[in-house]
UniProtKB/Swiss-Prot annotation:
Keywords: Catecholamine metabolism, Cell membrane, Deafness, Endoplasmic reticulum, Golgi apparatus, Hearing, Membrane, Methyltransferase, Neurotransmitter degradation, S-adenosyl-L-methionine, Transferase
Name of the featured protein: Transmembrane O-methyltransferase homolog
Species for this entry: Danio rerio
Localization, UniProt: Endoplasmic reticulum; Golgi apparatus; Basolateral cell membrane
Lineage: superkingdom: Eukaryota
SUPFAM superfamilies for the chain: S-adenosyl-L-methionine-dependent methyltransferases
Region (Sufficient for localization to the Golgi apparatus): 1-45
One GO BP annotation of this record: methylation
Length: 259
């Protein structure tokens, strides 16, 4: 049995750790514990609960209303790891500056980033959005259509990214990708980047934007991008979406080819 004296000796260390990592404890509570309790009580998924909230509070056909309502849900009701409004502005700027025609999104989740991109793309542009989870894909489709974007603008593909990328040219007639948004499993970032390189679908000026490269992090992806000589790399520092105090960032890779 631990004596009171020893316990008291460790108390300052414990308090220091709690204070230092308090935002991570809050994230654990919001993203894991709250979700588990509400899943048990409601009998439906967190993503479906978010859709029901958006359906009740947002204006159909108004993409900004959809995004604002989603942000309110994620910041005040339940945490969902969307790109969020702050990092979303980085994405908005890239879209405005580059006017991509063909976009590949890896990790649709609930469709937040899909809606954010679709509202800013030029006429004739098309998004191929890939989501491997069937339930998430179903929710995303409802949110994307509620925002007013049809199949001509957004094609949702419910398959793993490593199956989709090699067949984009053959199955969908894609010749070049102007922008790729990576926001799926972080361990897939580097393998999928290699698949994109091998496919020949990224060319001079193609942009790969990868979210959450600081937290939870994609160190191998960043290391390769910086060392391979194929990309100009810029990391946009930010905080984790809907959370204070947890550093995060987005990596912007511009393909320049072999130097």
């Amino acid at each position: 049995m631990v004596s009171p004296a020893i316990a008291l000796a460790f108390l300052p260390l414990l308090l220091t750790l709690i204070i230092r990592y308090r935002y991570y404890f809050v994230l654990l509570y919001r993203a894991v514990l709250t979700r588990w309790v509400r899943d048990c009580l409601s009998g439906i998924s967190r993503e479906e609960r978010a859709f029901q909230y958006i359906l009740t509070h947002a204006t159909p056909g108004d993409s900004q209303s959809i995004l604002d309502t989603f942000d309110t849900w994620c910041s005040k009701v339940e945490f969902i790891s969307n790109i969020g409004p702050k990092k979303g502005k980085i994405l908005d700027r890239l879209l405005q500056e580059n006017c991509p025609i063909t976009v590949l999104e890896l990790g649709t989740h609930c469709g937040y980033s899909t809606v954010r991109m679709a509202r800013s793309l030029p006429i004739g542009a098309r998004i191929y959005s890939v989501e491997m989870d069937q339930r998430n894909a179903q929710v995303a489709e409802k949110i994307i259509r509620l925002a007013g974007f049809d199949d001509d603008m957004v094609e949702l593909i419910q398959r793993p990214s490593d199956e989709v990328i090699p067949r984009l040219r053959e199955d969908l007639g894609v010749e070049r990708l102007d922008l790729v948004l990576m926001d799926h499993w972080k361990r897939c970032y580097l393998p999928d980047l290699h698949l994109l390189e091998d496919s020949g679908l990224i060319g001079q000026g193609s942009i790969i934007l990868a979210d959450n490269v600081i937290f939870p992090g994609a160190p191998n992806f960043l290391r390769y991008a910086r060392r391979c000589g194929l990309y100009e790399v810029r990391v946009h520092r930010a905080t984790l979406e809907y959370m204070r105090g947890i550093p995060d960032g987005m990596a912007e890779l511009t393909y320049i080819g072999i130097k």
